[in-house]
């Protein structure tokens, strides 16, 4: 099948909303409507205020920049599609298709001025068959029929032999996986119910190899505070595969669609922090807005706090609850949510994998930190607050109450800013998150 020829990616996203490419008239109409909505929202200060009501000024600035970038990208998508359709120049559209062989056929059809009906007639098949092929980007077509369509559209197929593990046999793909890591994943997976007790080392090696083929190797492990290379981290592969499998099960339940411009509910999310079961309520609220949150314990040695990526076009946030404290939970959740909202088109398809420790050297991670920090504690309020320098728990707790957030969040912020994790250790909501969320795992 054609899927074995495709450039492997961490996710295959087929929606025009997140892929940034328009391939038919319906997607063109939808994109134009979205541009119109963005233009209206950005047309005046009052329009922006209405859309971002209740959000801190610092967050409003970030959201506004995201909207401007979104509008610019959508206009470029429209230009690429119309240029291919009206002039036959498919260069811009092909650039957006990248090396995806299925999308390349659709681009070629558009550039030749063929409708789906025209192509079906030339192939001697029903129009509905072309519609099905294009709906899944030709994933379901046989190699023989792919070659037939490609020939009709004057698309050349080339085979290149290169030293790339994604094009080698399964044994070569997982040759670097140690027995120790295999045993570690087996122990963890059996304990957590990832797979049955009957799975052996050989089967797990095949599972890991197939996962690398399906998702590819992430070129970077993006951390909340720095960027480090984890392109061959087998523990990350295994954990990510588990998240993706659980996310697909949730997607099958037909959740509401996600809209990065729908942000009016964010203040309500922050207000949930004051509740004892706030983490559980937060996960339900995100699901109501088309964002899946999966709580899955990390494999020992991985040291991951959270992740954000797309699965079948749906945003997924993964949390490990590596540190069982309320302050860490809320900051990690909102950091990943920042990636979903701010970076929906500019990184989420590759994915973000976050650790809470060290110093950020990545622009998108710094943006996510800023978004999460200001959403929880508005920068202007924090700069004027005596709680920043207070040693009295009462002063800090009063500030949190005035803000309408859990005091653990403020105590955690102080510990981090002062780089002193010995203070207020009993004030950050320890041992209160796993108990209510790990039952999901």
Residue map of PLM features:
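Short basic helix-loop element that most often maps to the first helix and adjoining turn
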Residues: 103-120, 249-250
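Helix-turn-helix DNA-binding elements, focusing on the entry/boundary residues of the two helices
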Residues: 105, 116, 127, 146, ...
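DNA major-groove recognition helix of helix-turn-helix/homeodomain DNA-binding modules
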Residues: 143-159
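Active-site hotspot residues in diverse enzymes, especially metal/ion-binding acidic/histidine motifs
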Residues: 166-441
